[in-house]
Curated annotation (Swiss-Prot):
SUPFAM superfamilies: BRCT domain, DNA ligase/mRNA capping enzyme, catalytic domain, Nucleic acid-binding proteins, RuvA domain 2-like. Belongs to the NAD-dependent DNA ligase family. LigA subfamily. Residues 610-691 form the BRCT domain. It comes from Burkholderia multivorans (strain ATCC 17616 / 249). It catalyses: NAD(+) + (deoxyribonucleotide)n-3'-hydroxyl + 5'-phospho-(deoxyribonucleotide)m = (deoxyribonucleotide)n+m + AMP + beta-nicotinamide D-nucleotide. Zn(2+) binds at C425, C428, C443, C449. SMART domains: BRCT, HhH1, LIGANc. GO terms for cellular component: cytosol. This is DNA ligase.
Length: 691
């Protein structure tokens, strides 16, 4: 946004203050409304501080529309009632297509629209269509272009004064743009919270160990109705204008769509997802179009709103009870509903993740009947205090998997039972384990478990694993679904006739796959270890294991302490490796794989023990960037001195060498009381000064 106005000197404080307010409001509009920031943060802060100082030195220069007034006033003892000059009416709702057709017919009949012999309207009604936001309705009052008051809907006649809180919403202008502004303007609109801002707010709530909000609407409503505006100022609220109450000093726009265009010219935020359509079919087309993009919108909506576009026709139609005859809210199917939780089972994912699943009494929600819903993980079940027998809130949004949001505690029966995570996989019977610091429990039968079969086979065939060319996902799907392959070992039992019968698999493709399988029988120990798909064991760790132990049996039988001696193997990785080989089902598949005629690799002696040095038996972790040494240089020097260089910090770590931009490893070392050294300290350590 261009800033062509000349910068006034500091010797003219009144002119300077007005100029600063203008610059800051332009920046706010570009940032919060247009989403096109054109002033660097540092420059904005400098101008803001200068304006604060000017107003402090000259209190008579403070104006209600000053950006400095957004920070909020003193804590209020309560909200003052506000009587609306024009009532804030609610809308009648429609749900089915027939409701919309009936609404259009009522409007057309009342306006005397002409129809043909079949009863169809030949002069269709013109409608303005908008989104129905899932937020909190408010009224903004501007006098001569300056924001003076904000109030909630309340009962439609009397609301609550939330002026100081609304001042903190950056997308709401404190002064309207343009030379011609009305004497009085009541803007009607919605305060809401965008999905990304809601997620960030809940992250902050969790970090501060404060209550999280259930959904963006609750967060917006709770934030707006804070007694302390300073709290509201910390909440990322937004606003969209969509209606009008009172207008004095200027003529009312002829159409609703013209009103919204005028609002944009005044600098008010207006949503762009709107259209002018004709007749019932136009309304239904808009509804379906919005429904298709609903989940991708950055904010929650619960429907769309239809309004007769022409103001004179609105006046002719008037009102019934507390709702306008000229408008209708077309609601989406409810996304949340109540039902009974009858049981909690678990399902096993492709990677072995064990997910608790709620078994529900059937409930219609989000346009479909739901009988199962995810509970995510054991910790979530505990955090939400969900028990078998509870009445629960189920949410289903679009194609998202239904989830249980929470329990209705005042309906909890006396015999409600807590969930207990099973100790064995319900699919294969292998042990279920949960590693420290992980939220997900997992089945340990990676090579054996049918639920993990496709993922295990796909990983086994990868280029960096056994490199079985021609064994893609579609072929794996067929092999598993036809029950031809249960474990990776079964791949080497496949014959030409079996493969040639697969769908869209020609004889040449079958022969090529057999050739690839034959080639894959001759591999390396590192590739074989990587192909097993052990959690947390990547290509590099597989190479380190092969180099350290020399052969497979010592790895399979290693203790956790022995695994921790391997380069870059920390406690979590060691525990994962140990669990994998402790599962008898996995050992059985490995024996099948290395049976005569199957997979082979050259084996050798374990790597020689590192020479005894000044750091023999010590474990060191490197983090951050050292001034003069690369990570590899430092690692080589430490290993030459007999130290083990680990990739993660644990209680068994002896030293942490920290450079610039050290992250979580440094924080964990400090929390555990582990000595932290810089590059100079590293050199002293290598010289034998272990302090």
């Amino acid at each position: 946004m261009a800033r062509t106005q000349a910068e006034p000197p500091a010797s003219q404080p009144d002119v300077r203050a007005a100029w600063l307010r203008d610059q800051l409001e332009r920046a706010n509009y570009a940032y919060y409304v247009l989403d096109q920031p054109d002033l660097p943060d540092a420059e904005y802060d400098r101008l803001f501080r200068e304006l604060q100082q000017l107003e402090s030195d000259h209190p008579d220069l403070v104006t209600p529309d000053s950006p400095t007034q957004r920070v909020g006033g003193a804590v209020a003892s309560g909200f003052t009632p506000v009587v609306h000059d024009a009532p804030m009416l609610s809308l009648n709702n429609g749900f089915a297509d027939d409701d919309i057709v009936a609404f259009d017919k009522r409007v057309a009949d009342a306006l005397g629209k002409t129809t043909d012999l079949a009863g169809s309207v030949t002069d269709p009604v013109e409608y303005a269509c908008e989104l129905k936001f899932d937020g909190l309705a408010i009224s903004l009052r501007y006098e001569h272009g300056v924001f003076v008051q904000a109030s909630t809907r309340g009962d439609g006649t009397t609301g609550e004064d939330v002026t100081e809180n609304v001042r903190t919403i950056r997308s709401i202008p404190l002064k309207l743009k343009g030379d011609r502004v009305p004497a009085v303007l009541d803007v009607r609109g919605e305060v809401l919270m965008f999905k990304r801002d809601f997620a960030r707010l809940n992250e902050r709530q969790r970090a501060a160990e404060q209550r999280e909000f259930a959904n963006p609407r609750n967060a917006a409503a709770g934030s707006l109705r804070q007694l302390d505006p300073k709290i509201t100022a910390q909440r990322p609220l937004s606003f969209f204008a969509y209606g009008i109450g009172v207008l004095d000093g200027m003529p009312m726009p002829d159409t609703h769509s013209a009103l919204l265009d005028w609002y944009e010219a005044l600098g008010l935020p207006v949503n762009r997802e709107r259209a002018v359509v004709y007749g019932a079919q136009g309304l239904l087309d808009f509804f379906r179009k919005v429904g298709e993009k609903r989940e991708s919108l950055p904010y929650d909506i619960d429907g769309v709103v239809y309004k007769v576009n022409r103001r004179d026709e609105q006046d002719r139609l008037g009102f019934v009870s507390r709702a306008p005859r000229f408008a209708l809210a077309h609601k989406f199917p409810a996304q949340e509903a109540l039902t009974k939780l009858v049981a909690i089972g678990v399902q096993v994912g492709r990677t072995g993740a064990i997910t608790p699943v709620a078994r529900l009494e059937p409930v219609f929600v989000g346009g479909a009947t739901v009988t199962n819903a995810t509970l995510h993980n054991e910790d979530e079940v505990r955090r939400k205090d969900i028990r078998i027998g509870d009445t629960v809130i189920v949410r289903r949004a679009g194609d998202v998997i239904p989830e249980v949001v929470g329990a209705v505690l005042d309906r909890r029966p006396a015999d409600a039972a807590e969930f207990v995570m099973p100790t064995e996989c319900p699919v294969c019977g292998s042990k279920i384990e949960r590693l420290p610091d992980e939220a997900i429990a997992r089945c340990t039968g990676g090579l054996f478990c049918p639920a993990q079969r496709k993922q295990a086979l796909w990983h086994f065939a990868q280029r960096r694993a056994l490199d079985i060319d021609g064994l893609g996902e579609k072929i794996i799907d067929q092999l598993v679904e036809l029950n031809l392959v249960r474990t990776p070992a079964d791949l080497f039992n496949l014959g030409f006739a079996t493969l040639a019968e697969l769908d869209r698999f020609a004889e040449k493709s079958a022969q090529n796959l057999l050739d690839s399988l034959e080639k894959a029988k001759h591999t390396t120990l590192a590739r074989f270890i990587y192909a097993l798909g052990i959690r947390h064991v990547g290509e590099s760790t597989a190479k380190d294991l092969a180099k350290h132990f020399g052969s497979l049996d010592p790895i399979m039988n290693a203790t956790i302490d022995e695994l921790l001696e391997v380069n870059d193997v920390g406690p979590i990785v060691a525990e994962s490796i140990h669990q994998f080989f402790a599962e008898e089902h996995n050992r059985t598949v490995i024996e099948q794989l290395r049976a005569p005629g199957k997979v082979t690799w050259p084996e050798g002696p374990p790597a020689p023990k590192a020479p005894q040095g000044v750091l023999a038996g010590k474990t060191v972790v490197l983090t951050g960037t050292l001034p003069n040494l690369t990570r590899d240089d430092a690692k080589e020097m430490l290993e030459a001195a007999g130290a083990k260089v680990a990739g993660s910090v644990s209680k068994k770590t002896d030293y942490v060498i920290a450079g610039a931009e050290a992250g979580s490893k440094l924080a964990k070392a400090e929390a555990l009381g582990i000595p932290v050294l810089d590059e100079d300290g590293l050199h002293q350590l290598l010289e034998g000064n272990t302090r």
